[in-house]
Design a protein with these regions (language model features):
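Eukaryotic chromatin- and chromosome-associated nuclear factors
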Residues: 1-182
Length: 182
């Protein structure tokens, strides 16, 4: 594991895991790193947030070793976002985030005596299951890929939530070097 990966996937880190199995392709499940593992087997031990152990105690969270290549940091979420037709999104469905495409935008207008509000729901098509399902904006996020330590496409700074750990303060402004007499 490289130095950056050690930081992203240290004990207690919130992560997402994909499974390359039939019925799970194109989905990501959130979990917490319980234990990092040596370089030789490139696996880490995860406790999943929404997946349950397949035993008589169905309320116990699933815990298992997963390949490091199937793990990424928790995907970023924008504070507020609307989506357009053909946007590639992740929709929270069946306990995980599933990749799909927005196929319809349904606008809702709500009126009462004091004010008027509007909201939207989105119809999303999932290639993997050939299903089309309607979602509220809060259950969608822009689809992003984790590529060598960077999210693609990148977050728009004004729309993103602040990081979970505080960022270091910016460095003090550099002073110009003193003028030299020639």
């Amino acid at each position: 594991m490289g130095k950056e990966e050690e930081e992203w996937f240290k004990r207690g880190a919130e992560v997402e895991v994909s499974f390359n199995e039939q019925g799970f392709r194109g989905s990501w499940y959130t979990g917490t790193v319980l234990r990092t593992v040596s370089k030789k087997n490139n696996k880490i031990f995860i406790e999943f947030h929404t997946l349950k152990a397949d035993d008589k105690k169905a309320s116990k969270p699933l815990r298992q070793f997963v390949d490091l290549v199937d793990v990424r940091p928790l995907a970023p979420r924008e504070l507020s976002r609307s989506f357009n037709l053909s946007d590639l999104v992740d929709a929270f469905h069946n306990d995980g985030w599933w990749e799909g495409t927005v196929t319809d935008v349904i606008h809702h207008h709500h009126h009462n005596s004091n004010n008027s509000t509007s909201s939207s729901t989105y119809s999303v098509f999932f290639r993997s299951s050939r299903e089309q399902i309607e979602f509220h904006e809060s259950d969608l996020r822009l689809h992003r890929e984790w590529d060598h330590g960077n999210w693609k496409p990148q977050l728009e700074p004004q729309l993103s939530q602040p990081p979970t750990s505080p960022s270091p303060p910016p460095p003090p402004p550099q002073q110009a070097p003193p003028a030299r007499d020639n």
